[in-house]
Regions:
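Hard-cation-handling environments
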Residues: 1-146, 151-155
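Catalytic centers of hydrolytic enzymes
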Residues: 144, 148-192
Length: 192
């Protein structure tokens, strides 16, 4: 164990993060100014692939605050089991007023949204290109009067593969911006 520790410590300066990093306000501006589809924005502060909760609404609130938002945005995903239960009771294409956000802290502050329910699907676990199980369910909603779609989940979700979005009958590359809860961008999304 000591040899491994020494080896890793001695190689620490050779590590280079390959993605772009930016503070939230700068990242938002980069997404808004990007002319190409699809801009992938990671909410790395709520990285569900390394054990975070997935319930932060901070980035969502950033986009909602943009006046005259011209882009269409997909959030994959935000965990809120209470809102999920509320949405699960209504029919597809029905509208509902929701409070999305767990209110556990400032980052997960609840936001009031008028949404239309589009689709319910399993949150699949994917290894490579193979589905190996499920981890809860999600409901895709459209925020009425905006270009924002959100997958609301009943459990912490890891959207790491295009197959996750295919479960909801959506092509993530149809969106101008996709917000994922990842630290390192997974290969399916890194090409963008």
């Amino acid at each position: 164990a000591d040899d491994l520790k020494s080896y890793v410590w001695n190689k620490r300066y050779e590590f280079h993060y390959t993605g772009k990093t930016a503070e939230p306000e700068v990242a938002l501006q980069m997404a808004l100014e990007c002319d190409k589809k699809t801009f992938v924005l990671t909410d790395s502060g709520d990285n569900t692939t390394s054990g975070s909760t997935g319930w932060n609404t901070f980035v969502l609130r950033q986009f909602l605050a943009v006046k005259n938002l011209k882009k269409n945005i997909l959030f994959g995903s935000i965990k809120d089991e209470y809102t999920y239960k509320q949405l699960d009771k209504i029919n597809i294409n029905a509208s509902e007023m929701i409070y999305l956000g767990m209110n556990k802290d400032e980052l997960s502050k609840s936001v009031v949204l008028n949404v239309k329910k589009l689709k319910k699907a399993d949150i699949i676990l994917v290894h490579g290109e193979k589905v190996i199980g499920t981890l809860g369910q999600g409901i895709l909603v459209h925020v009425i009067g905006t270009g924002i779609d959100i997958i609301v989940t009943n459990r912490t979700a890891r959207m790491t593969n295009t197959l996750n979005f295919e479960e909801f009958d959506i092509n993530w590359t149809d969106y101008d911006v996709v917000v994922l809860k990842q630290g390192y961008i997974f290969p399916d999304f890194k090409a963008k």
